Design a protein with these regions (language model features):
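Non-catalytic interaction-recognition regions
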Residues: 1-320
């Protein structure tokens, strides 16, 4: 029904783009720019001219196989097939545009059905005279939804799909962002809709947010009480483990950035919440001999949790 409604419009592209932007804004995602493929049409001839090509079977081929591709690619179709540039030509024009805009890392984010593009894009980079190692390709897997313990069957061909807005309606923006960021690009993403909507410790995003809110409550009750980073003569094991975990945060963020692995952040946040809850269960913060230091410790924990949640676009509530 959705596609039928769109097809009946005079300018379906504008309508679809507006719908996408509205959904993404709700999902806390903002693109700096939107570029239509047609904007590269004028650059096609220059891109093709920059490549080593040859004619075969009435088509124009580009030599990408010497640069790591598994075969050469048709870049201009034969007259029998319309004689127009193939999609490889658009890829070449876009790749050149990335380089001309001054970027040294050319990152592509593709879907699970685009594994064949890895060799193709790297081969194109080499054929254009660029180092293929500058091309980074992240292949993200499909999202599987579970409802009442059963997988939701989805098929684009049959029109059986779940739109992002429907997922946000069911579990909220925070949970959706958490679960979509919680897996690496090479791992299938499975979202248990029932669990993601729960307000319990079994739901990891709730569990981490609750740790933040719990600390906020402690700090509110502390009022203007003194805070000191000076540790007591002897640290409890739970204090020591929590401090060590907090000290890991800069390294976790740096590694997540370098490896294009944001999933490391929520995984780390769960460990921080685990360590905090363990510490809080075993030790009083207020009205304890180490109150000033423990207030500093829980405040540091709150800051790290808030920063981790912010990095994956999840809110850090003060109350729950």
């Amino acid at each position: 029904a959705y596609m039928w409604d769109v097809a009946k419009q005079d300018d379906p592209i504008a309508s679809m783009l507006e719908s996408l932007q509205t959904t993404l804004e709700r999902f806390r995602v903002r693109f700096d720019s939107w570029v239509r493929q047609s904007s590269f049409e004028a650059a096609l001839s220059d891109a093709i001219a920059a490549l080593e090509t040859y004619e075969q079977d009435g088509a124009v081929w580009v030599r990408t196989s010497p640069h790591g591709d598994d075969k050469d690619r048709v870049i201009v179709r034969s007259a029998e097939k319309g004689g127009k540039p193939a999609y490889v030509a658009w890829d070449a024009a876009y790749l050149r545009d990335k380089v001309e805009r001054g970027f040294d890392r050319l990152i592509y984010v593709l879907g699970a059905d685009h594994h064949g593009y890895v060799g193709r894009l790297k081969g194109l980079a080499g054929a254009l005279g660029f180092d293929p190692e500058r091309v980074e390709i992240l292949i993200y897997q499909l999202v599987q939804l579970l409802e009442h313990g059963e997988a939701t069957k989805m098929s684009k061909r049959q029109g059986d799909t779940v739109f992002l807005d429907e997922l946000l309606d069911a579990i909220g923006v925070d949970a959706a962002r958490w679960y979509l960021a919680n897996r690496g690009p090479d791992q299938p993403i499975e979202i248990d809709v029932d669990l993601a909507a729960e307000r319990s410790a079994k739901n990891p995003v709730f569990y981490v947010q609750y740790a933040h809110a719990r600390i906020a409550g402690v700090l509110r009750n502390a009022g203007d009480a003194a805070v000191s980073a000076e540790p007591p003569a002897e640290l409890a094991p739970e204090e020591r483990e929590l401090i060590k975990r907090l000290a890991d945060f800069p390294g976790v963020v740096a590694e997540a950035t370098e490896r294009r692995g944001p999933h490391a952040i929520p995984i780390y946040a769960i460990k921080v919440a685990d360590d905090f809850h363990r510490f809080y269960h075993e030790h009083r913060v207020l009205e304890s001999e180490a109150q000033a230091f423990r207030l500093a410790l829980v405040r540091a924990t709150q800051l790290v949790i808030a920063c981790a949640l912010n990095l994956v676009g999840v809110e850090a509530p003060e109350r729950m």
